[in-house]
Amino acid sequence: MGEKIVNPEVTVVMPCLNEAETLATCIEKTLETFRSYNIKGEIVVADNGSTDGSQKIAMDLGARVVPVARRGYGAALQGGIAAASAPYIIMGDADDSYDFREIPRFIEALRNSHDFVMGCRFPAGGGEIKPGAMPFLHRYLGTPVLTALGQIFFHHRFKDVNCGMRGFTKRAFEEMALQSDGMEFASEMVARAAMINLKSCEVPVTLHPDGRSRAPHLRTWRDGWRHLKFMLLLCPRWLYRMPGLFLSLLGGIMTLILAITPLSVQGITLDIHTLMVFQMILFLGLQILLFGHLASYYAEQNHLIPPSHQKPWVNPVESGALWGGLFMILGASGLIYTFDLWRDVGFGPLETSQTLRLFSISIFGIILGLELIFVGFLFGLFDLMGKRNKDHTP
C-alpha cells in the first residue's frame, strides 16, 4: 500500500477513480515539490474502486493507497483524510487540472496559523484559468452563482467555492464533521468552515485543462443542483425564514386592510375573494416560518448547524396552548357573532358583504390556533429529545 512516512508535516490527499492517465504526473509533481522545498510529506491516494491499474501506479511511485468502498467524491476524500498522518492536509484532484507544485502556498498559510485555506482559480482572487480548462457554464454561471450565494448564506469572503485544491488542519477537519458523500462535499466544507468560524484565507491557483482523454466525473446540472441543495439545507434562514417572512407580511397586511373594507386601485376592486387569496398567502407564510423554526431546531440538536443566538421557545407546549387558545377564542367569537346575525334573519340568506369577511377571518383564526397548539407539542417533543441528548453527552 506504499511506504508510510514517519511524522510527516503534510499529507496530500488525491481522490482517485480510474485516473491512470494522469495520476503519475500528479504524484511526481508533489514529490518534486517535497524535495524542492524540503517538505516532509506523504501522499495518500484515496481509491474509490479503480479498475485501470491506478493503485499500482500510485504504490510504485511511493504513495500510500487507501481503498474506499463507499462511492462518491466526498466519500473518497473522507476516507483518505481519515487515513492521513500529518497535522496539515492538502486535497487536490488527480486529473492534472491542478498543479501540485503550488502546494507551498497552502503550507505557508497553514504554518501561519490558518485552519482552512481555499484555492482560488479566478482572476479576482489572483488565480488563472487556462484556455479550455473550465466549461463556459461553470465559469460564468455555476461557480459565480454558488459563490455569491455562499457569501450571502454563510458570510464568507471566498471568491471561488468550487476550487478542488484546498488545505486545512486535521483538527479543523474533525471540527467540521462533514457528512456528504458526493460532489456537494466541497460546498459543505466551505459552509461548515464559515459556520464554525475557522481562521481562513484564500490563495491563488492555476487551473489547467483536464489531462484525461475521457469525460470528467462532474455532471454540470446534477452536481450543480446537489451543491445548491446542500447549501440551502444548511441555511434555514434563507430557505424558510426569508420567504416565510415575505409571504406573512404581504398576506397579513392585505388581510388586515381587506378585512375592514374593499380596496380600489385604478379601477380594480379588491374585495372578499381577494381577501381569501391573501389569507391563503398569510397561512402559507406562517406555515413556512414554522417549518423553518422546526428545521433550525432539529439541525441544531443534531449538530448540523451551530446553535443560534436566539432564545429558544420557552415552555413550547404551554406557549403554543396559550397563543393557540387565544386565536381559537377570537375565531370562535367571530363565528358566534355570525351565527347571531344568521339567527336574526330567521336562518335565511345572509348579506355576503356584511358577514363573509368576518366568517373567513374567524375560520382562519381557529385553524391557526389549532396549528399552534399541536406545533407547541411537537416543539415540546424536540425539547425533550434535546435534553436527553445533552444528558447522554460524555
Residue ranges and their predicted role:
Residues M1-E32, I39:
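N-proximal low-complexity "stem/linker" segments adjacent to membrane-targeting elements
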Residues M1-N7, H155, L178-P394:
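Hydrophobic helical membrane-anchoring modules
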Residues V68-A83, Y88, F100-M183, D210-F230:
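Acceptor/aglycone-binding surface of glycosyltransferases and processive sugar-polymer synthases
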Residues E19-T22, S50, Y73, D99:
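Donor nucleotide-sugar binding loop of glycosyltransferases
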Residues D47-Q55, D96:
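A conserved acidic beta->alpha catalytic loop
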Residues V12, T30, G80, D95, ...:
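Residue-level signature of catalytic and energy-coupling elements of molecular machines
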Residues Y37-V44, Q55-A83:
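Conserved donor nucleotide-binding strand/loop of the catalytic core
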